[in-house]
UniProtKB/Swiss-Prot annotation:
The keyword Metal-binding applies. The gene is recR. This is Recombination protein RecR. It comes from the Bacteria. Residues 80-175 form the Toprim domain. Belongs to the RecR family.
Length: 198
C-alpha cells in the first residue's frame, strides 16, 4: 500500500514499538490523524517530556523523575531485603500488590548468550556494590520464569552464595515463560510468600 510520506513516517514510528506490526501501526497512524490537533500536540509533548525528564535511580536503577527514586528515598522501607527484577515495569507490578516493603534492584535485562548479553551488560555490577552494605540480609530473585530469567537468577545466586546473604527465588505461581508485569496482585503476592532459598 502506498501512503503519503508523512503517514508512512508515522506508521514506521509506531512499528518501532514492541508488539506493533504494520496493520496496528497503520490503524494507530490513522487514529492520530483523526485526533484534534491539540490532543496530538499534548500526546507529542507527553512523549518528549517523558523521554527528557525521566532517568534511572542511581541506587536501584528504577525509572524516576527524582534521584533517588521514591522507593529508595522512603526511610520506612525494610533496607535488609532487596528484590531483584528485570525491568522497571516489574517494580510497578510488585508495588501494586502492596505486600513487599523492601527495596528493589532493576537489572535492565537478563543474561542472554544467544543475543550476546552477558552479566556485565546488565545491572549486576551495581547490585554487587549495593550488597557490600552489611545491612542486607536477603536478596529475592524475581526475574521472569523463562529461560533467560532463570539463567540470570541462577547466575546471581551462584555469585552470591559465598557472601552468606540469604538468596531466595519467588515461587512459580507465575506461568513459565510469563512476564511479571502481566501477573495479577494475588498471584504475585502468593509467589512472594512461596519464595524458596536458592
Amino acid at each position: 500500500m502506498h501512503y503519503p510520506e508523512p503517514i508512512t513516517k508515522l506508521i514506521d514510528s509506531f512499528m518501532k514499538l514492541p508488539g506493533i506490526g504494520p496493520k496496528s501501526a497503520a490503524r494507530l497512524a490513522f487514529y492520530v490523524l483523526d485526533m484534534k490537533e491539540d490532543d496530538v500536540l499534548d500526546f507529542a509533548k507527553a512523549l518528549v517530556d517523558a523521554k527528557r525528564n525521566l532517568s534511572f535511580c542511581s541506587v536501584c536503577g528504577h525509572i524516576t523523575d527524582k534521584d533517588p527514586c521514591y522507593i529508595c528515598a522512603d526511610t520506612s522501607r525494610d533496607r535488609s531485603v532487596i528484590c531483584v527484577v528485570q525491568e522497571s515495569k516489574d517494580v510497578i507490578a510488585m508495588e501494586k500488590m502492596r505486600d513487599f516493603h523492601g527495596l528493589y534492584h532493576v537489572l535492565h535485562g537478563t543474561i542472554s548468550p544467544m543475543d550476546g548479553i552477558g552479566p556485565e551488560d546488565i545491572n549486576i555490577p551495581d547490585l554487587l556494590k549495593r550488597l557490600q552494605d552489611d545491612t542486607i540480609e536477603e536478596v529475592i530473585l524475581a526475574t521472569n520464569p523463562n529461560v533467560e530469567g532463570e539463567a540470570t537468577a541462577m547466575y546471581i545466586s551462584r555469585l552470591l552464595k559465598p557472601s552468606g546473604i540469604k538468596v531466595t527465588r519467588i515461587a512459580h505461581g507465575l506461568p513459565v515463560g510469563g512476564d511479571l508485569e502481566y501477573a495479577d496482585e494475588v498471584t504475585l503476592s502468593k509467589a512472594m510468600e512461596g519464595r524458596r532459598e536458592v
